[in-house]
Regions:
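Aromatic- and carboxylate-enriched substrate-binding clefts and catalytic-loop regions
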Residues: 82-84, 144, 156, 173, ...
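Beta-strand-rich binding/interaction modules
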Residues: 65, 79-80, 90, 95, ...
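Residue-level recognition of beta-strand termini and adjacent short loop/turns
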Residues: 35, 71-75
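Catalytic core of carbohydrate-active enzymes
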Residues: 490-495, 499-500, 507-518, 528-531, ...
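Generic recognition of flexible, low-complexity loop/linker segments
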Residues: 55-56, 66-67, 227-230, 237-239, ...
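An acidic- and aromatic-residue-enriched active-site/binding cleft used to recognize and process polar
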Residues: 74, 82-84, 113, 120-124, ...
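Catalytic and substrate-binding clefts that recognize carbohydrates or anionic sugar/phosphate headgroups
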Residues: 2-17, 22, 45-50, 58-61, ...
Length: 747
């Protein structure tokens, strides 16, 4: 049986080998030369006999391709090889080089056994071994190993990252290939590259990954899809980037469907397989996680700063159906002194629920502009739900079809998403077509001109795959679609309102430029909360600064729409939300705090704490957008050398100064790991030494384990407010975590 063999298990060859497929493995380079500061390496590829025991197929001549090595500042080395007509380019929606990215000319010194590649300052950046391995021959039982590409990279001049030149059991039995490509029906279709991994190496990142902190041993399909929850291998936000405990990160510059194995298929290798006949890989090394993530942002863009009001409370549910209903809720929040900044209208503001036509229902919202302006006078911004598909019975369908604003379908498809209606989505808006993008922006502009301040760019993970898009094949557009979609909504929002913001669910590399993103349709349960936090931590280690989640989860169980959320889940998730970059209440049933009377006073207290902390959140956000830091920081972001931290995914740093440990059970107990340092309990003022566990803590429902660095000064707002319109950040004061600090509610 072919199972668990590299050819079939990772490279996805048909087990019965009935298709016209071939595998071409990289051999020892034949020559090397310098060109415009790059190093070009001519690499021959030998066709392989398709079998569990790989061997060269000498009936086919070798094919030779050029591998390019380019060096940048910030400890970044780039590898590029195209097996078709592709060439290296910086013109990509995913790339947005910062001024820190400067090309460093490379030079090569050739000796008999190796080619040394250095920058002009003499620092080693790559090394290629061209001498065959030394053998002590005594047996002819097995064939000699095939030629290979033995390449080592030194992106920062210090750390060595090797291609997996010899990851095999015996010469015919490969578990990974350093570099190879695949053909089908004579056409080059896929390419693979592998780096060595170490036995104790740990990994993180890859997007909003709902998994444990250390991703080693796992293999992921980098194909965006509706995650349908936060407790499975599906995800809304794949990012082709990972971080290693060896203090390097790798960004695979592609939007093709891909597979990434982090020492999963082979414990000796990190393997990448792209459904595209080219590889463009950036390897980034640094002394800290922040340096590596900043290097990634140097390549793909920095987050922009969300507006002040976005850091306040957002209130929503699925869904409000009328202006009267919304006004009643907003007035009650003000009357009962619940601070709040944003009211979100989900799927119910249209003529028909879920029928997105980008127009208000005239009966239930008779004066939308007046309605929005009235809310603004009360201190509320309005956010609106929509999605990037046009329904068969939407009023825009004829215009969209006639002008190719939606990609024409080549055959009918069934929806794979989580829409809760029977609508037939006739097509996906084609953001590869500039006229379609402008048409879509026009639909949003009409709403923004009324005073709407944020567009919820829901969905975008799935597109119609059997459709003709103007600028790209659907197989390449699928992952990139999130970026094009959110960019369009962000740009028109900023143009009209002056505030750059979206509320987005899907993501790919580069989407961090257009905040902000939330974690999708989590279950209102302890495992839903835990899964959300795991996803947020990995997302922050994938280049994103801002992230939120539905409080207290989106859907319920066992009844998806109608089960009741437990008080303690609502309370504990509120605490988690207060210590997140953004906090929005949303879900399939009522989310307003007065529906939970037993805990409503505690909820109000925590909402007020959120507004007290907004000066700190703004301060940390400004630092984040100019660095590599997220707001929600995994412990490994600060302590990558601490092995324990690679196995903790239920605690996090909130900014630089807070350590947060949400309670995610009904027993009101948990263990807390305090990293190295001196810590102060934010609620009790207790002083604690780090580098140890606090076991079986009893945590009252109105508190959460939150610790602040001893000696820190936390900017806080001294006055109670109804919304951020009442705030003047110049009036913020410093809360000194000194011997006089007795706890936030006691000072």
């Amino acid at each position: 049986m072919p199972h668990n063999y590299h050819l079939f298990d990772f490279l996805d060859f048909d087990p019965d080998l009935s298709r016209d497929e071939s595998l071409w493995k990289a051999y020892k380079p034949t020559s090397v030369y310098e060109k415009d500061g790059d190093i070009c390496i001519n690499v021959p590829f030998q066709k392989q006999v398709l079998s569990n025991d790989m061997a060269p197929d000498t009936t086919s001549p070798r094919e030779e391709y050029t591998l390019v090595i380019r060096q940048y500042t910030s400890g970044i080395t780039r590898l590029f090889i195209g097996f078709g007509e592709e060439s290296m380019t910086d013109q990509s929606e995913m790339l947005q080089f910062s001024d820190r990215v400067k090309k460093l000319p490379l030079q090569v010194t050739q000796t008999e056994g190796e080619w040394l590649i250095t920058t002009q300052d003499g620092i080693q950046r790559a090394l290629i071994h061209v001498k065959p391995p030394v053998l002590d021959r005594w047996s002819e039982l097995l064939p000699d190993p095939q030629e290979t590409l033995d390449l080592r990279l030194y992106p920062d001049g210090k750390r060595e990252i090797r291609l997996a030149a010899y990851d095999h059991f015996s010469p015919p039995r490969y578990d990974a290939l350093p570099l190879a490509f695949c053909k089908r029906n004579g056409v080059k279709e896929r390419a693979t590259l592998s780096f060595e991994s170490k036995p104790d190496e740990c990994f993180a990142g890859t997007g909003e990954r709902f998994a444990k902190m250390d991703l080693s041993g796992q293999t992921f399909f980098l194909k965006n899809q509706d995650g349908q929850g936060v407790n499975n291998r599906r995800t809304y936000k794949n990012i082709p980037f990972y971080l290693s405990s060896r203090m390097y990160g790798t960004f695979y510059h592609t939007c093709a469907h891909s597979k990434l194995s982090l020492a999963g298929q082979s414990t000796r290798s990190v393997q990448f397989l792209s459904d595209q006949a080219m590889l463009d890989v950036f390897v980034i090394a640094g002394d800290t996680m922040e340096e590596i993530l900043r290097g990634y942002r140097d390549l793909t863009g920095y987050p922009s700063m969300p507006p002040l009001w976005s850091f306040g409370i957002w209130m929503s549910r699925m869904t409000y159906f009328s202006a009267d209903e919304v006004n009643e809720i907003c007035d009650r929040m003000r009357a009962e002194h619940y601070p709040c900044d944003v009211i979100h209208l989900d799927t119910g503001w249209f003529k028909t629920d879920w029928l997105c036509e980008w127009k208000f229902n005239e009966e239930r919202f008779p004066d939308p502009k007046g309605f929005i302006q009235g809310l603004k006078k009360k201190g509320y911004r309005v956010s609106l739900w929509q999605l990037p598909y046009v329904a068969e019975n939407a009023e825009q369908i004829d215009e969209a079809r006639k002008n190719d604003y939606i990609a024409p379908l080549t055959k009918k498809q069934d929806s794979e998403g989580s829409n809760f209606s029977a609508l037939d989505y006739a097509g996906t808006i084609d953001f590869t077509y500039p006229k379609a993008t402008e048409w879509y922006k026009g639909l949003l502009k009409n709403l923004l001109d009324m005073g709407v301040t944020c567009i919820k760019t829901d969905f975008g993970e799935n597109i119609h795959m059997d459709a003709l898009y103007k600028g790209m094949k659907p197989e390449l557009l699928n992952n990139l679609y999130a970026l094009l979609y959110q960019k369009a909504a962000y740009e028109i929002t900023k143009d009209v309102t002056g505030d750059g913001i979206v509320w987005a669910r899907s993501a790919w590399a580069g989407c961090q430029r257009y905040p902000l993103h939330w974690g999708g349709d989590s279950c209102s349960s302890w495992d839903g909360m835990a899964g959300s936090l795991k996803g947020g931590l990995h997302f922050g280690l994938s280049g994103f600064a801002f992230w939120s989640h539905d409080v207290p989860g989106f859907h319920t169980l066992p009844n998806f729409m109608n089960s009741i959320v437990d008080d303690d889940v609502y309370m504990r998730w509120t605490q988690f939300g207060v210590f997140s970059s953004h906090i929005r209440y949303h879900g399939t049933n009522k989310r307003e705090p007065w529906h939970y009377p037993a805990i409503a006073p505690m909820i109000k207290k925590w909402w007020k704490l959120r507004y007290t902390l907004i000066p700190y959140i703004v301060e940390q956000s400004r630092k984040a957008i100019a660095s590599g830091a997220p707001l929600l920081q995994a412990l490994i972001f600060h302590h990558p050398e601490d092995k324990l931290c690679w196995h903790i995914d239920d605690e996090y740093y909130f900014g630089n100064d807070f350590l947060v440990a949400p309670v995610m059970n009904s027993e009101n107990r948990r263990d807390v790991y305090l990293p190295e340092g001196k810590w102060v309990n934010f609620f009790t003022g207790e002083r604690l030494e780090g580098g140890r566990w606090l076991k079986n803590l009893d945590v009252p429902l109105d508190e959460m384990p939150v610790y602040v660095r001893q000696g820190a000064t936390i900017p806080v707002y001294p006055d109670e407010v109804e919304c951020t319109d009442d705030m003047d950040l110049s009036k913020s004061i410093g809360l000194h975590i000194d011997p006089h600090f007795k706890g936030i509610f006691k000072n």
